Amino acid sequence: MALSDRLEMVNPSEIRKLFDLAQGIEGIISLGIGEPDFDTPEHIKEYAKEALDKGLTHYSPNIGILELREAVAEKFKKHNGIDADPKTQIMITVGTNQQILMGLATFLKDNEEVLIPSPMFVSYAPAVILAGGKPVEVPTYEENEFRLSVDELEKYVTPKTRALIINTPNNPTGAVLTKKDLEEIADFAVEHDLMILSDEVYEYFVYDGVKNYSIASLDGMFERTITMNGFSKTFAMTGWRLGFLAAPEWVVEKMVRFQMYNATCPVTFIQYAAAKALRDERSWQAVEEMRREYERRRNLVWKRLNEMGLPTVKPKGAFYIFPRIKDTGLSSKEFSELMIKEAKVVVVPGSAFGQAGEGYVRISYATAYEKLEEAMDRMEKVLKEKKLV
């Protein structure tokens, strides 16, 4: 039987391979998983139960229920400065990951190029390939806190370039683009007539008084931007699989068509729960409590990593930290395997996030504070015993 050429070009995530290696090891501490360790707030669960009891278990419109789209529109206007019509410019999806491929499929032609800042979230390049395009990695650097610069973008743009993916706050580096960064990127996109996919799933988890900005809020940028977001990180709802986006009407119309023949619609009763959650002050109190705890954990891990001899930029957002391990003489994969076998700690090799990730590892601090302390102790012990720092 013939296999799809495109699927053959997409490899399984290195992260999953690492988790397979760690399985069965007693006493393992995983700092590899990219999801909140917090449970979904109780009132959101209650809203879902209420929706079930009301029989809201049938198909919804392919675009998502209007009640949720209206709540999302309110959120975009209040928190992001984005004015989107809930009837035609907002869509509900099955998680946010799905939006990358669907969004690219609305405009990307075969062999057109998509610029992706590297290190990058593992789903971006495969989505570009599956949509028929060519991913082009644009390196970001530790010296610039891993923030994307237009100077680097200019080195990689070609007549075939059709789009740019940005992710702020960033997975895996924790970088947050400034308003000035976004203004320069916006000018670059206009100059080269590019579409932008802006992944903002970590938007509420920023630290040290930093503010996160949406590029679609800048003058003239809504018409060329797909603002991707969801409930997984914000409300600790990873298993619920519910996302939302704002985009020009022509993009939404095509993405709805894709969803129609792919997932049909997101889960109906979950949509009703999410609509109420967005308008409930308790939800935002929970977000702020999570943000404060993530910041406390970040401070611990950043301090300990630097103290043990792994130079580390202090991340401004998300819940990841990206220490440099080059001076150990190990590749990022070798370092990660050593930590699993000797320290019983899972960290993800930077190479899993693109070429610019080599020489680093990703650590998630979405783990209990006490476990983070123990993990740092174990890592430091192994590094010193092996004389790697």
Swiss-Prot record:
The keyword Transferase applies. It comes from the Archaea. It catalyses: an aromatic L-alpha-amino acid + 2-oxoglutarate = an aromatic oxo-acid + L-glutamate. Pfam families: Aminotran_1_2. One of its GO terms (molecular function) is aromatic-amino-acid transaminase activity. CDD domains: AAT_like. The keyword Transferase applies. Its cofactor is pyridoxal 5'-phosphate. Optimum temperature is 95-100 degrees Celsius. Keywords: Aminotransferase, Pyridoxal phosphate, Transferase. It is an enzyme of class 2 (transferase). GO terms for biological process: amino acid metabolic process; biosynthetic process. The modification N6-(pyridoxal phosphate)lysine is found at residue 233. Its EC number is 2.6.1.57. Belongs to the class-I pyridoxal-phosphate-dependent aminotransferase family. Homodimer. PANTHER family: ASPARTATE AMINOTRANSFERASE, ASPARTATE AMINOTRANSFERASE-RELATED. Catalyzes the transamination of phenylalanine, tyrosine and tryptophan. Shows virtually no activity towards aspartic acid, alanine, valine or isoleucine. This is Aromatic-amino-acid aminotransferase 2. It comes from Thermococcus litoralis (strain ATCC 51850 / DSM 5473 / JCM 8560 / NS-C). The lineage of its organism: Archaea, Methanobacteriati, Methanobacteriota, Thermococci, Thermococcales.
